[in-house]
Regions:
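Glycoside hydrolase catalytic-domain groove-lining segments
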Residues: 217-252
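Hydrophobic faces of well-ordered beta-strands that scaffold small-molecule active sites
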Residues: 41-44, 69-73, 109-113, 172-176, ...
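N-terminal carbohydrate-binding accessory modules
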Residues: 17-70, 100, 104-108
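Active-site neighborhood of glycoside hydrolase catalytic domains
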Residues: 144-223
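Aromatic-lined substrate-binding rim segments of carbohydrate-active enzymes
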Residues: 56-122, 128, 194-205, 223
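Active-site-adjacent "subsite" loops/lids of carbohydrate-active enzymes
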Residues: 117-158
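Sec-dependent N-terminal signal peptides
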Residues: 4-14
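Acidic-and-aromatic substrate-binding clefts and catalytic sites of carbohydrate-active enzymes
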Residues: 48-54, 80-81, 85-90, 181-184, ...
Length: 252
């Protein structure tokens, strides 16, 4: 009996490891490729801090039951760094635990670390204490702002970089900034945020940016995947057609 239990335990451990094998995710011609095969991203937006941790698994199961295969996660800066230099990724703020729970249910994750996330959240996720610096210019190349962004992104990377699909995790893409074209035109700033995201360790999965079709040309970077936003009631074909004009082979 003891040998049988040992064998069963070994089989379970091996099965768990098999589910966490390193993989690949990339943008191919007109489609995303998961481990080299066409993959349609069906994503649900889930805000982990708005859900009590004891209900996380239930919400993930609900998303999967709706036919989703991916979860999009904003990372709320002012949640994780309520005061300067004091980072908290525990309890209901444990985004890594949420990602692992999603993987348990066969779900992939798209990380959207901002630094600005909007999401009908206070200051779009930017910490209030940034404003204690009277001269700070948010969402610009302001030295103080960029320094604090870099420090926060580094902490996010420490939590999540090992969960990239290439390392056996379930993170398949990471977003750079958020709808910046609705705020300003500043490619150097968007480029700097891209570099900050990469410096945080997100170098093994595609990076992308999202904007409205009316302004995605303003800050579009050639080395990022472009995605287009549109509201309820929009002509979807028309919106995608605008993206196809400038990126004819981009995945939709």
């Amino acid at each position: 009996m003891k040998k049988l239990l040992t064998l069963l335990l070994a089989m379970l451990l091996l099965a768990g490891c098999a589910g966490n094998k390193p993989g690949t995710f990339e943008a191919g011609k007109n489609t995303f490729l998961l481990n080299g095969k066409p993959f349609i991203v069906k994503a649900a937006e889930v805000h982990y801090p708005r859900i009590p941790r004891e209900y996380w698994e239930h919400r993930i199961e609900m998303c999967k039951a709706l036919g989703m295969n991916t979860l999009c996660l904003y990372v709320f800066w002012n949640l994780h760094e309520e005061t300067p230099g004091n980072y908290d990724f525990t309890g209901n703020k444990d985004i890594a635990a949420f990602c692992k729970l999603a993987q348990k249910h066969g779900m992939y994750v798209i990380v959207r670390p901002g630094p600005y996330v909007c999401a009908e959240w206070e200051m779009g996720g930017l910490p209030w204490w940034l404003l204690k610096n009277d001269s700070v210019e948010l969402r610009t190349l302001d030295p103080y702002y960029m320094e604090r962004v870099g420090m926060f992104m580094h902490e996010v990377g420490k939590q999540l970089e090992d969960l990239q699909i290439t390392r056996g995790g379930n993170i398949i893409m990471v977003q750079v900034e958020n709808e910046y074209g609705s705020y300003a035109t500043d490619k150097p700033y968007v480029s700097a945020i891209r570099d900050t995201v990469r410096a945080a360790g997100f170098t093994e999965v595609p990076l992308f940016q999202c904007d409205w079709s009316s302004n995605f040309l303003n800050n579009g970077l050639d080395d990022l995947i472009w995605t287009v936003n549109f509201g309820t009631g929009a002509d979807i074909d028309k919106q995608f057609a605008k993206l196809r004009e400038v990126r004819p082979e981009t995945p939709l």
